[in-house]
């Protein structure tokens, strides 16, 4: 007898996988870390860190500095990744962190980036909320 169901969307293999992490620090403010994601995130240690606020051009520049970047831009005839969708998702997370002081940390790994025009999907995410804001 089933007690529940889990329904998940099937997605095609991504062009690339990103790690996106945002962390609030009382001294430095909010930092944004973008890196090669998925199962190789810790193995490769391929990350770029920015301090918020950031704009889309700065996020694109950080992605472009990753060792993963050639795979996202059509390496050896492969499809190009939907970087616009990835940047939109990253900017939405950054804006959420800036606009809600209760958010301590957001981590998405992987952000699966599909081929151009096909979006980016957060396959796994964790959000830490600080309820000690007096609200």
What are these regions (language model features)?
Residues 1-135:
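ATP-dependent carboxylate/acyl-activation modules
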